[in-house]
Amino acid sequence: MAQKQTPSGPTQRQQRVAELIRHALAEVLQRGDIQDPVLGSHVVTVPEVRMSPDLKLATAYVMPLGGQDEAPVIAALERHKKILRQEVARRVNLKFAPDLRFRRDETFDEAARIDQLLRSEKVQRDLESAPREDDEGEPASSSRD
């Protein structure tokens, strides 16, 4: 029986397989199994992998440590996609080895942007002028100990 994709996100199986593939990719990249000057000169992190519902496509979000030279690193990973797929298949027991797709991880940029917004003067003013509430939803007393 086919498993339905819920609109709320990936299934538990997709998440479990994605995590196994993330660990396998990270291990291959950390050990230096791929002989490439670009990959050899960068430490590449794999913070997230997302699986398609049929588990035949894995999208790996990658970022070189320090955030520099993402384009050459992703190009090198794409060049060695076949070898990486074989290594992942060897480490993860699946019926089919998923095709790998590499994308730039933008979560660090997004986190920095949100941090910058939270530190802006306008937000600081709004936070200072907003009435505080205690756990019960009642305005907190203004006395401080």
From Swiss-Prot:
Superkingdom in the source lineage: Bacteria
Biological process terms in GO annotation: maturation of SSU-rRNA
The entry's keywords: Cytoplasm, Ribosome biogenesis
Main location class: cytoplasm
Record Gene3D superfamilies: 3.30.300.20
Keyword Cytoplasm set for record: yes
GO CC, one annotated term: cytosol
GO molecular function, one term: ribosomal small subunit binding
Alphabetical list of Pfam families matching this protein: RBFA
Cell compartments where the protein resides: Cytoplasm
Membership in a protein family: Belongs to the RbfA family.
HAMAP family the record matches: RbfA
Protein name from the UniProt record: Ribosome-binding factor A
Classification lineage: Bacteria, Pseudomonadati, Pseudomonadota, Alphaproteobacteria, Hyphomicrobiales
